[in-house]
Amino acid sequence: MKPSIYSLTRDELIAWAVERGQKQFRATQIWDWLYKKRVQSFEEMTNISKDFVSILNDSFCVNPLKQRVVQESADGTVKYLFELPDGMLIETVLMRQHYGHSVCVTTQVGCNIGCTFCASGLIKKQRDLNSGEITAQIMLVQKYFDDRKQGERVSHVVVMGIGEPFDNYKNVMCFLRVINDDNGLAIGARHITVSTSGLAHKIRDFANEGVQVNLAVSLHAPNNDLRSRIMRVNRSFPLEKLFSAIEYYIEKTNRRVTFEYIMLNEVNDSIKQAQELADLTKTIRKLSYVNLIPYNPVSEHDQYSRSPKERVLAFYDVLKKNGVNCVVRQEHGTDIDAACGQLRSKTMKKDREKVTATK
């Protein structure tokens, strides 16, 4: 199975081409074809010799993904189900915002973090995506825009899809370098957010990278007891370790951290828990932000339900009175399979039913 050429940074592409007797400018031409003209095959690169096109074809594919399902919401949100070369399925979501077009990418096939409310973890991690497979998600959404010929572009990226990005650290960092490259897609670092469930040692590594990419932490509980019950990762990285790493990140980067907090009815949404959350974030208040997220119910996790609006607002009010920067997240795609992992799970179930029916 040939790797995608999207898995190379520009410097890596230059080194690869030079090793094969090409001048540096040849790699620059190829890079332009990929990310500015956004061709789908090497044969479309008209200023590259046929001999070198043949070498490219022998070494790489361009986009390794196949589009299986597309769902479009009334609010313009588009959810894609892509098939990988080995037949596995991943999800990608395009969200239209007032400030631009944001794409949520997947980094792993399945997830081992084990959050008890999440559709992503219904299927255990089967493998990491390589950097080319992550980049390819952006490229196919950008192709959707290019085909519409309205001058639209992917302006923001959130690494919040299926999987734990910091459990696939090397490939995620390569992906970030590719999409941020000024000579390519040129998606600004401050328009990119990486979300982690709380791998404290990787937060420290990320702080040391020196990148301007935003960091979000999936918190979802204000104390160790509850967080360990609903997020298995907390047993390895309890709040003390997590917040030590977050404080290191803030000190090292002077950048704000966003805390994601899914509102689960009568689980983590009480007034007492709001005060606990305010107290937990007190020492980093100036450089932290809390995002309260309405829960998208998952049939396999029917022990959870969405917090009523009045409970969300009461929770929000406590945070605001304590000086916490916070917002209730605007929902997208509520009329389609909105929860992360839902579309993939449903499609896999249908595929299994088809196989069973033919036996």
From Swiss-Prot:
Q: Provide the coiled-coil residue spans.
A: none
Keyword list (alphabetical) reads:
4Fe-4S, Cytoplasm, Disulfide bond, Iron, Iron-sulfur, Metal-binding, Methyltransferase, rRNA processing, S-adenosyl-L-methionine, Transferase, tRNA processing
Chief localisation class: cytoplasm
Q: What's a GO cellular component annotated to this UniProt protein?
A: cytoplasm
Q: What are its E.C. numbers? A: 2.1.1.192
Q: Which residues bind S-adenosyl-L-methionine?
A: 163-164, 195, 218-220, 296
Where does the chain bind [4Fe-4S] cluster? 111, 115, 118
**Could you tell me which cysteines form disulfide bridges?**
104-340
Active-site residue numbers? 91 (proton acceptor), 340 (s-methylcysteine intermediate)
Which cofactors are required for activity? [4Fe-4S] cluster
Among the record's GO biological process terms, what is one? rRNA base methylation
- First-tier enzyme category under EC: transferase
Q: Which GO terms describe its molecular function?
A: 4 iron, 4 sulfur cluster binding; metal ion binding; rRNA (adenine(2503)-C2-)-methyltransferase activity; rRNA binding; tRNA (adenine(37)-C2)-methyltransferase activity; tRNA binding
How is the cofactor bound, in the record's words?
Binds 1 [4Fe-4S] cluster. The cluster is coordinated with 3 cysteines and an exchangeable S-adenosyl-L-methionine.
Q: Which reaction does it catalyse?
A: adenosine(2503) in 23S rRNA + 2 reduced [2Fe-2S]-[ferredoxin] + 2 S-adenosyl-L-methionine = 2-methyladenosine(2503) in 23S rRNA + 5'-deoxyadenosine + L-methionine + 2 oxidized [2Fe-2S]-[ferredoxin] + S-adenosyl-L-homocysteine; adenosine(37) in tRNA + 2 reduced [2Fe-2S]-[ferredoxin] + 2 S-adenosyl-L-methionine = 2-methyladenosine(37) in tRNA + 5'-deoxyadenosine + L-methionine + 2 oxidized [2Fe-2S]-[ferredoxin] + S-adenosyl-L-homocysteine
The answer to keyword Protein transport applying to this record is: no
Report whether Chaperone shows up as a keyword of the record: no
- Which Pfam families does UniProt cross-reference here? Radical_SAM (PF04055), RlmN_N (PF21016)
Other remarks on this protein: Reaction proceeds by a ping-pong mechanism involving intermediate methylation of a conserved cysteine residue.
Q: Briefly, what is this protein's role?
A: Specifically methylates position 2 of adenine 2503 in 23S rRNA and position 2 of adenine 37 in tRNAs.
* This protein's name: Probable dual-specificity RNA methyltransferase RlmN
